[in-house]
């Protein structure tokens, strides 16, 4: 994914020279610049102006190559450059990513990449599927397996059911699913193998959310020629290219929205300091209201379902199975997952530490890196305490997956998260393949792109933690 030798440094400079004031050679000539302009922006993201993401992201990566030099022999990819807008988080992310896919472990390297293919294919994430297909072959994988699941070993095919549930409805996972994989037989999984596989599946599901949420594009050829662009939904084909939100035409209204958001944040922080308590019954009622209202938070009806690509369908069983709202009208909903009954800190982390000790600490660090990441800024304002906003985003993501915190007032979610942001969050977390540039542009119109990437880091980690909590709870019940 990223390399720290001279080849990598040259590649980073290739990225940087296309940003204003870039390093390296004097940059592309006038003819080359005009050619690039005719082709349109050709950066790592379809949503973020090339100058911003390449300048900040690539420079951040270059400054952090000392750590990566010890661990990798890949290439700098577009995902890494965009995530590099937040280098402190990227360090934690990369440590776990490298552990899961490149160090010794219960599963063979080629198997891990095949599991990653299975996970990414559930969301039709061609970016990750293609990347892991290449690495699968590089690590000695059998090319026959790439013809589809039917060519893979039975042991891998047995992961399909839990892969499907983790990707779309993790609350349906039970101890019986765990038992079916661990029961004695010819194609049985060991507990150590299964834990690594489950962490890898949730890692790649949530990484698919990040890829779609940030509009990550395939890498271009080495000579700088453009790679195929991400498909654009028909409803957006006439949309103009993404603009810097700090200069958008609705600047006055957007600036007023920022001021109003900051006022609400300040009021909430003051009420917390005054300890204006809310009864437990009222807290529960507000959660149920938020969960019910999330039914109405859906993408626009004119957004067409993306057509599954045959190259990915071959890795997917039951392709029509997808996310369904945790609480559906007229349906018997599963019981709410009370976070206090099975927390990451007290239950999930300790189980992972026992069964996959090298991964538990890195997982915890990655969750904390995303949750606590702050620059104390909002749009054009600095010195801002953003903790209540970050908590509202994290808890709303868990809410759409049916997880409730008894000590959290879900009234804060409605006060802090505008509808466009809710639509974006739910789409990226639950059915990321439906994410569009228009959704990205509509929320937080006066915020920096790096702040929108920050939202995607919260999405990635909150989604992964939610799915892991359901899976680890099922394992705990199986073991007791």
From Swiss-Prot:
<dbReference type="GO" id="GO:0005737">
    <property type="term" value="C:cytoplasm"/>
</dbReference>
<dbReference type="GO" id="GO:0042149">
    <property type="term" value="P:cellular response to glucose starvation"/>
</dbReference>
<dbReference type="GO" id="GO:0071230">
    <property type="term" value="P:cellular response to amino acid stimulus"/>
</dbReference>
<dbReference type="InterPro" id="IPR006730">
    <property type="entry name" value="Sestrin"/>
</dbReference>
<dbReference type="GO" id="GO:0070328">
    <property type="term" value="P:triglyceride homeostasis"/>
</dbReference>
<feature type="modified residue" description="N-acetylmethionine">
    <location>
        <position position="1"/>
    </location>
</feature>
<dbReference type="GO" id="GO:0005634">
    <property type="term" value="C:nucleus"/>
</dbReference>
<dbReference type="GO" id="GO:0051897">
    <property type="term" value="P:positive regulation of phosphatidylinositol 3-kinase/protein kinase B signal transduction"/>
</dbReference>
<dbReference type="GO" id="GO:1903432">
    <property type="term" value="P:regulation of TORC1 signaling"/>
</dbReference>
<dbReference type="GO" id="GO:0034198">
    <property type="term" value="P:cellular response to amino acid starvation"/>
</dbReference>
<dbReference type="GO" id="GO:0141161">
    <property type="term" value="P:regulation of cAMP/PKA signal transduction"/>
</dbReference>
<feature type="region of interest" description="N-terminal domain; mediates the alkylhydroperoxide reductase activity">
    <location>
        <begin position="66"/>
        <end position="239"/>
    </location>
</feature>
<dbReference type="GO" id="GO:0042731">
    <property type="term" value="F:PH domain binding"/>
</dbReference>
<dbReference type="GO" id="GO:0070728">
    <property type="term" value="F:L-leucine binding"/>
</dbReference>
<dbReference type="GO" id="GO:1990253">
    <property type="term" value="P:cellular response to leucine starvation"/>
</dbReference>
<dbReference type="GO" id="GO:0071233">
    <property type="term" value="P:cellular response to L-leucine"/>
</dbReference>
<dbReference type="GO" id="GO:0006111">
    <property type="term" value="P:regulation of gluconeogenesis"/>
</dbReference>
<dbReference type="GO" id="GO:0030330">
    <property type="term" value="P:DNA damage response, signal transduction by p53 class mediator"/>
</dbReference>
<keyword id="KW-1017">Isopeptide bond</keyword>
<dbReference type="GO" id="GO:1904504">
    <property type="term" value="P:positive regulation of lipophagy"/>
</dbReference>
<dbReference type="GO" id="GO:1904263">
    <property type="term" value="P:positive regulation of TORC1 signaling"/>
</dbReference>
<feature type="cross-link" description="Glycyl lysine isopeptide (Lys-Gly) (interchain with G-Cter in ubiquitin)">
    <location>
        <position position="175"/>
    </location>
</feature>
<keyword id="KW-0007">Acetylation</keyword>
<dbReference type="GO" id="GO:0004601">
    <property type="term" value="F:peroxidase activity"/>
</dbReference>
<dbReference type="GO" id="GO:0032542">
    <property type="term" value="F:sulfiredoxin activity"/>
</dbReference>
<dbReference type="GO" id="GO:0046323">
    <property type="term" value="P:D-glucose import"/>
</dbReference>
<dbReference type="GO" id="GO:0016239">
    <property type="term" value="P:positive regulation of macroautophagy"/>
</dbReference>
<dbReference type="GO" id="GO:1904262">
    <property type="term" value="P:negative regulation of TORC1 signaling"/>
</dbReference>
<feature type="modified residue" description="Phosphoserine">
    <location>
        <position position="249"/>
    </location>
</feature>
<feature type="binding site">
    <location>
        <begin position="374"/>
        <end position="377"/>
    </location>
    <ligand>
        <name>L-leucine</name>
    </ligand>
</feature>
<dbReference type="GO" id="GO:0098869">
    <property type="term" value="P:cellular oxidant detoxification"/>
</dbReference>
<dbReference type="GO" id="GO:0031588">
    <property type="term" value="C:nucleotide-activated protein kinase complex"/>
</dbReference>
<dbReference type="GO" id="GO:0031932">
    <property type="term" value="C:TORC2 complex"/>
</dbReference>
<feature type="binding site">
    <location>
        <position position="386"/>
    </location>
    <ligand>
        <name>L-leucine</name>
    </ligand>
</feature>
<dbReference type="GO" id="GO:0005829">
    <property type="term" value="C:cytosol"/>
</dbReference>
<keyword id="KW-0963">Cytoplasm</keyword>
<feature type="binding site">
    <location>
        <position position="451"/>
    </location>
    <ligand>
        <name>L-leucine</name>
    </ligand>
</feature>
<dbReference type="GO" id="GO:1902010">
    <property type="term" value="P:negative regulation of translation in response to endoplasmic reticulum stress"/>
</dbReference>
<dbReference type="GO" id="GO:0140311">
    <property type="term" value="F:protein sequestering activity"/>
</dbReference>
<dbReference type="GO" id="GO:0009749">
    <property type="term" value="P:response to glucose"/>
</dbReference>
<dbReference type="GO" id="GO:0072593">
    <property type="term" value="P:reactive oxygen species metabolic process"/>
</dbReference>
<dbReference type="GO" id="GO:0005765">
    <property type="term" value="C:lysosomal membrane"/>
</dbReference>
């Amino acid at each position: 994914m990223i390399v720290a030798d001279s080849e990598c440094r040259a590649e980073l400079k290739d990225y940087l020279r296309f940003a204003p004031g870039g390093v390296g050679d004097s940059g592309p000539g006038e003819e080359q610049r005009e050619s690039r302009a005719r082709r349109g922006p050709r950066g790592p993201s379809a949503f973020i102006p090339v100058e911003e993401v390449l300048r900040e992201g690539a420079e951040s990566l270059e400054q952090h190559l000392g750590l990566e030099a010890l661990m990798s022999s890949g290439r700098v990819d577009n995902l890494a450059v965009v995530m590099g807008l937040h280098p402190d988080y990227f360090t934690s992310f990369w440590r776990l990513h490298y552990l899961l896919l490149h160090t010794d472990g219960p599963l063979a390297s080629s198997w891990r990449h095949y599991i990653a293919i299975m996970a990414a294919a559930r969301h039709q994430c061609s970016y990750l599927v293609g990347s892991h297909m290449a690495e699968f072959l590089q690590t000695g994988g059998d090319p026959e397996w790439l013809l589809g699941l039917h060519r893979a070993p039975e042991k891998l095919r047995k992961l399909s059911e839990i892969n499907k549930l983790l990707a779309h409805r993790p609350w349906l996972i039970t101890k019986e699913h765990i038992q079916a994989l661990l029961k004695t037989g010819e194609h049985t999984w060991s507990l150590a193998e299964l834990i690594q596989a489950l962490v890898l599946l949730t890692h790649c599901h949530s990484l698919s959310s990040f890829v779609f949420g940030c509009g990550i594009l395939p890498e271009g050829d080495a000579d700088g020629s453009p790679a195929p662009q991400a498909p654009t939904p028909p409803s957006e084909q006439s949309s103009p290219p993404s603009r810097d939100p700090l200069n958008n035409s609705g600047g006055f209204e957007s600036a007023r929205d920022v001021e109003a958001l900051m006022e609400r944040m300040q009021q909430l922080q003051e009420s917390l300091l005054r300890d204006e308590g809310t009864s437990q019954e009222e807290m529960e009622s507000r959660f149920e209201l938020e969960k019910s209202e999330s039914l109405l938070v859906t993408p626009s009806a004119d957004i067409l379902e993306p057509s599954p690509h045959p190259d990915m369908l071959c890795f997917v069983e039951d392709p029509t199975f997808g996310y369904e709202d945790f609480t559906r009208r007229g349906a018997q909903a599963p019981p709410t997952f009370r976070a206090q009954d099975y927390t990451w800190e007290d239950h999930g982390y300790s189980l992972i530490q026992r069964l996959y000790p090298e991964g538990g600490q890195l997982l915890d660090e990655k969750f904390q890196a995303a949750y606590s990441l702050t620059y104390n800024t909002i749009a054009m304002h600095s010195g801002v305490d953003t903790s209540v906003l970050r908590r509202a985003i994290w808890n709303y993501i868990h809410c759409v997956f049916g997880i409730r915190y008894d000590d959290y007032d879900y009234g804060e979610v409605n006060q802090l998260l505008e509808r466009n942001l809710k639509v974006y969050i739910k789409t990226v977390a639950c059915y990321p393949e439906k994410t569009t540039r228009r959704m990205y542009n509509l929320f937080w119109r006066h915020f920096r792109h790096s702040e929108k990437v920050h939202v995607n880091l919260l999405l990635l980690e909150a989604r992964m933690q939610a799915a892991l909590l359901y899976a680890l709870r099922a394992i705990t019940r199986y073991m007791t």
